[in-house]
Amino acid sequence: MTSTGKDGGGAQHAQYVGPYRLEKTLGKGQTGLVKLGIHCVTCQKVAIKIVNREKLSESVLMKVEREIAILKLIEHPHVLKLHDVYENKKYLYLVLEHVSGGELFDYLVKKGRLTPKEARKFFRQIISALDFCHSHSICHRDLKPENLLLDERNNIRIADFGMASLQVGDSLLETSCGSPHYACPEVIRGEKYDGRKADVWSCGVILFALLVGALPFDDDNLRQLLEKVKRGVFHMPHFIPPDCQSLLRGMIEVDAARRLTLEHIQKHIWYIGGKNEPEPEQPIPRKVQIRSLPSLEDIDPDVLDSMHSLGCFRDRNKLLQDLLSEEENQEKMIYFLLLDRKERYPSHEDEDLPPRNEIDPPRKRVDSPMLNRHGKRRPERKSMEVLSVTDGGSPVPARRAIEMAQHGQRSRSISGASSGLSTSPLSSPRVTPHPSPRGSPLPTPKGTPVHTPKESPAGTPNPTPPSSPSVGGVPWRTRLNSIKNSFLGSPRFHRRKLQVPTPEEMSNLTPESSPELGHLQLFGNPVSKVRSVAMELVILVQTLAYTSFRLLGTFLPVRYLRHSVLSRPPERARLVLRGAPCTHMGPVWNMVGMAYTQNPPIMGETGVYGSQWVMSSAPSKHYTSLGLSVPSPSCSLSPSLFPFCAPDTTNCMEVMTGRLSKCGTPLSNFFDVIKQLFSDEKNGQAAQAPSTPAKRSAHGPLGDSAAAGPGGDTEYPMGKDMAKMGPPAARREQP
């Protein structure tokens, strides 16, 4: 743990773990404190579990490493997620998902007891997550309301896998662990036991506590409590539904052989009752191809270390022998599950860390050079300085080069789960296996090669960084996925709600606010079902507020379009527009963002602002964050950065309009209006000097009063007419 700040009296010290600033203490676990962490750029909240290496024994530290490896195996909506792992000589930091609802224990104490309907909701989510764990041979062994957290929507998150164990095949567990009130009789007797059966008993005790508000076995004397658990005799209140009583008796059964399994529980009449109640969210099945490993060189060292941390593969030679075997086995299944996790969520070095001086700062566990899915070793990742000079990557802004020289190269160790958090891709390109073709809004450093297109719509040079040669021949779908992944990072970020700006925020939409560009993340993961088209426009105006109202005036007359004004931070203006639902694609969202593309203008001069909108259509739960500002030093129309769009802006607009007009959709009118706005803007810029403000659009009802209009906090009325859209036209693929 590190601290920065002045040493004078009354100075505030800020403690950081990587990009996260440590705040208040959330709780205290068995191995250390849990503190709230806030990302210094994105303001994402996380829970950071701090483990003191010096105060814990080697066996306890091995349990922590086992917890890390187990959390990599589990990806379920009702299991707390692991983002990253940091460490230094004294501490180990686990960056976990933050949930704001607190413990189920506190919720139960507050409400006394729950209704059968609410108890069934929680119970279903617990069983769903536990069934997923058991299918991956993981037993929790410490289930209790204190380890069940609630998110902002009162959904369950199973936490604290410090006691969890991997139970392979028909083997039995020996370690007696857990809480006496929730432990099964065979664990208390010190016998070998089935971890899956022990978890079922604990779930039965939890369900009883939810319905009754008290525990089935309780006593102030620990010896008496253990005797009650061994006998398994408890009082069943009359207000518990009869069907639920039979379920409880089947789960809280002393004889482990007669105890219900998770399969029987999920088929029980009380569990499947309540037809109008929503089913627990099911995770996307992970199908991993198990292939043969020809030699030891083909085994990933990070995955091998993670498997060794699980505890059940302590014989390293036997583990290697099983992995190299031609037959499919449990060891190979776990190996390829961990390898799949590492492939999908690679852990990279941090960028854009706050400037600070520490003797022993926490360092992120990053991936070592590893093998890809085809058995070929990937080249070692290089630092940003090397990429900018040798491999033709995006040039590093001067600000980033200075910061990286101050911080130095981050150390590399065992792989940890990656949160994928990044700052704005405009200000600091992210190191990824596939270089991202993104530019920088900041001035290009001296000595960095640039090229100028032969023709520029505005007649001015348009210096851009040279494109990376490594992505030239890759199909556009692969490049699109690479761009989306570098934009969004790991899907494991905590989703943030969009805030409607206050009048003060909208009144401060001026270039003097800040030249820094923030990163906007709207929704969840990018999925293949999302269909989107993107456009960008660079406008010469004096204030950003004028640009906002001008575009807003363009959107107002479009039918079937609902919109609201967003802003974060104040120097960026955004609009979210919701169109009519499509028959096959679902609701249509349009994101419009505006930000500086050059330095803030001096009073009396014009400023250059970039505007991009993205129309995406998908089921509501699949919406992705595609509303990112596009940098462009040019004062003219610029080609879209998305590779599936036409290289020419006007042609791209024609492609989008034609594609949508085939559906007969009301949104085709929207693109017609925008296309006309583009045409007027292009003609206006061609007739004027680059320093002259562009003509105001005549399409919007705001007219010349747009710049002096009301505060941007006004939420305009949403359209009442919601028309059905026809089937979408096929996407036009371009190489």
From Swiss-Prot:
InterPro entries: BRSK1_2-like_UBA (IPR048622), Kinase-like_dom_sf (IPR011009), Prot_kinase_dom (IPR000719), Protein_kinase_ATP_BS (IPR017441), Ser/Thr_kinase_AS (IPR008271). The keyword Ubl conjugation applies. It catalyses: L-seryl-[protein] + ATP = O-phospho-L-seryl-[protein] + ADP + H(+); L-threonyl-[protein] + ATP = O-phospho-L-threonyl-[protein] + ADP + H(+); L-seryl-[tau protein] + ATP = O-phospho-L-seryl-[tau protein] + ADP + H(+); L-threonyl-[tau protein] + ATP = O-phospho-L-threonyl-[tau protein] + ADP + H(+). Residues 346-476, 493-514, 682-735 are annotated as: Disordered. Residues 411-429 have a biased composition (Low complexity). SMART domains: S_TKc. Interacts with FZR1, a regulatory subunit of the APC ubiquitin ligase complex. Interacts with COPS5. Interacts with PAK1. Belongs to the protein kinase superfamily. CAMK Ser/Thr protein kinase family. SNF1 subfamily. Serine/threonine-protein kinase that plays a key role in polarization of neurons and axonogenesis, cell cycle progress and insulin secretion. Phosphorylates CDK16, CDC25C, MAPT/TAU, PAK1 and WEE1. Following phosphorylation and activation by STK11/LKB1, acts as a key regulator of polarization of cortical neurons, probably by mediating phosphorylation of microtubule-associated proteins such as MAPT/TAU at 'Thr-523' and 'Ser-573'. This is Serine/threonine-protein kinase BRSK2. The lineage of its organism: Eukaryota, Metazoa, Chordata, Craniata, Vertebrata.
